[in-house]
Swiss-Prot record:
The gene is gatB. It catalyses: L-glutamyl-tRNA(Gln) + L-glutamine + ATP + H2O = L-glutaminyl-tRNA(Gln) + L-glutamate + ADP + phosphate + H(+); L-aspartyl-tRNA(Asn) + L-glutamine + ATP + H2O = L-asparaginyl-tRNA(Asn) + L-glutamate + ADP + phosphate + 2 H(+). Signal peptide: none annotated. It comes from Orientia tsutsugamushi (strain Boryong). SMART domains: GatB_Yqey (SM00845). Keywords: ATP-binding, Ligase, Nucleotide-binding, Protein biosynthesis. PANTHER family: GLUTAMYL-TRNA GLN AMIDOTRANSFERASE SUBUNIT B MITOCHONDRIAL AND PROKARYOTIC PET112-RELATED (PTHR11659), GLUTAMYL-TRNA(GLN) AMIDOTRANSFERASE SUBUNIT B, MITOCHONDRIAL (PTHR11659:SF0). It holds the Pfam family GatB_Yqey. This is Aspartyl/glutamyl-tRNA(Asn/Gln) amidotransferase subunit B. Heterotrimer of A, B and C subunits. PROSITE patterns: GATB. Its EC number is 6.3.5.-.
Amino acid sequence: MTFIEGKTEKWEYVIGLEIHAQIKSNAKLFSSASTEFGSSPNSQVELLDAAMPGSLPVLNEFCVHQAIKTALGINAKINKLSIFDRKNYFYADLPAGYQISQFYHPIAQGGWIEILDENGNIKCIQINRLHIEQDTGKSTHDQSDTYSYIDLNRSGIALMEIVSEPDISSPMQAAEYIKKLRAILRYLDSCNGDMEKGALRCDANISVRKPNSELGTKCEIKNLNSIKSIVRALEFEGQRQVNILESGGTVKQESLLFDATLGKTFPMRSKENATDYRYFPDPDLPPIILDQSLIDNIASSLPELPDAKITRYVNEIKLSDYNAQVLAADKDISCFFEEVIKTANPILTANWILSELFGLMNKDGITINECKITANHFSELIQLISSKAISSKIAKTVLKEMFDSGKSPKIIMQEKNIQQISDPNQIADIIDDVLKDNYQSVVSYRNGKDRLFGFFVGQVMKKTAGNANPELINEILHTKLKQFQI
């Protein structure tokens, strides 16, 4: 647990998150309009999305299946009866004057997600509910001094709102929770999790309290769209509330916005209660009634999720806990890894992905899907390393060329005339020349200056342009130094 340092004592964070995940579907929740991201404004809008009189909602069954799959993936209980309600409020990007949501009877309740806390211990974050609702349109206020612009392309896209219990005790835990939930959504293929495209957004409820005391007054930080912003917003807001309480004030229950440039939260409006929205069942939509056979069928099709994959990597492949967690955290990385190890050593593969390949990808800011290196070519490189056909130094050079060109390692080695010297006789002759040229250093080595061994290795590498087999160099050099006549 991370504490907030006040002037006189420590305070605890109490955090609950509401995650809004866009359901991965070609059509919207109640209309057949496209959900493709990046289209020109208001080009993917049907009559219902603009709330034209007489237009009626028709439920997209696929979105319901996606929500069931997600609920099962987070260990939630599926409700066989769920009902859509109207959430009434006015805003310019909500043309109907209400949002179709699920308040009284959500599609799923309960569930949990396990994360690692600051000490590396497993912590279970309880889920309160998962419900289906419409997304709103998007308002833009910075393109004109006199007008705001409305884009309804997003209006009506299916959302899953996943509400956690206030079990999160620090901004770091909040970040881990979102990363884990996003990974699960991507494995399930129910949401792409792209926060930069608005497919995953977060509202954070936060209060502070002294250890073992009653819960404080919570504030809600709205529309956080990156993990970095979530952490910064929670850190600032926690400290703000502590400062108010320690100065004798009271925290006002309100909705806040986070300014990422200033790193501060600002009041948006007083926080509403459920009664303010005047929820009532939508008269245009029948209840969702689910058969157990449908739920069982969806459950049987669930893929292996991150926690199960980590367990398999550790127990069967014998990866370290850390390597297993990093590889399993990203669905695409995991798929790449598993394709490579069909023909290559898994532990060596994991080490090279996490160190060398990640280093190149991070430098260029690309994902594994944008990387030119194929799984087959990477496997070929790992096989060359494990068979000692090339040294690690040569392999790093080849990998960089693979990364830049997309060519196979063997083609690169042919084009660059890269070939490891692995002939013991050839290496022995080179070592003889090095020792003769550095007679005085050999004398010093034999008199106890063991550190000179690295100097001799460097001289051999220099003569071979780094292409000699390092293990053979070490083995033969040890023998030659013992036998050298002084």
